[in-house]
Amino acid sequence: MKKLTLLISILSFCFILNGFAQEAKVKWYTFEEAVELNKTEKRKIFIDVYTDWCGWCKKMEASTFANPIIANILNTEYYAVRFDAETKDTISFKGKQFINVGGKSRSPHQLAVALLQGKMSYPSVAYLNEENQFITTVPGYYSPERLEPVLNFFAEDAFLRQSFQDYVSQQKTTN
C-alpha cells in the first residue's frame, strides 16, 4: 500500500510539474502580429534576433526563454517576437518594405540590419516602445538571471530615468 501511495504521489507531482512547464512557454508572435496587436493593446516589443546556425541563439531559446519567470515577464509585459535575421520574407513596417537583398546563404534581412543598427551579432534583442519606436539593442547571450533585470528595466520605463547600473544597484538595496 505504501508503494502504491508513493507511486501516486510521484505521478501527481510529475503532472503538476508538467502543468507548470506548459505555463512557462513564451507566446511568440511574428513581427507583423506584434505591431498589429500594439495598435489595440499597447506594450513594448521584445525582438529576439537570431539565426538557425547560431549556437548561442539555440542555447538562449532552450534555457533562457524556457524559464518560467522570463516567460511570464515576456507574456505579460511585451509582445515577444522571434525574428530570423536571414528570413526571405518581405516585411512591411512604417510604410517601408524590408527584404533580404543578399539572396545568398547567411545574408541578413534589411529589418535585422535596421534593428541591430548594422552590428550583426547573434543573438541580439531589440526593444521597441509602445509606439513601435526603437529603444535599443542588447547583443549577446543572456541567462535567465541576467535577462530578468534587463526585461524589468525596460518594462518599468526605468531606462527613461536612470542607467541600467543604477537600476540594478537600486534593486539590490530594495530586495
Positions of predicted regions on the chain:
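A conserved hydrophobic position in a structured secondary element of the catalytic/binding core
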Residues: V49, F65, F83
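Short active-site neighborhood of thiol/selenol oxidoreductases, capturing the structured segment around
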Residues: E41-G55, A80
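Bacterial Sec-dependent N-terminal signal peptides
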Residues: M1-E23
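Thioredoxin-like thiol-disulfide oxidoreductase module
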Residues: F31-E33, P68-P139, P144, P149-L160, ...
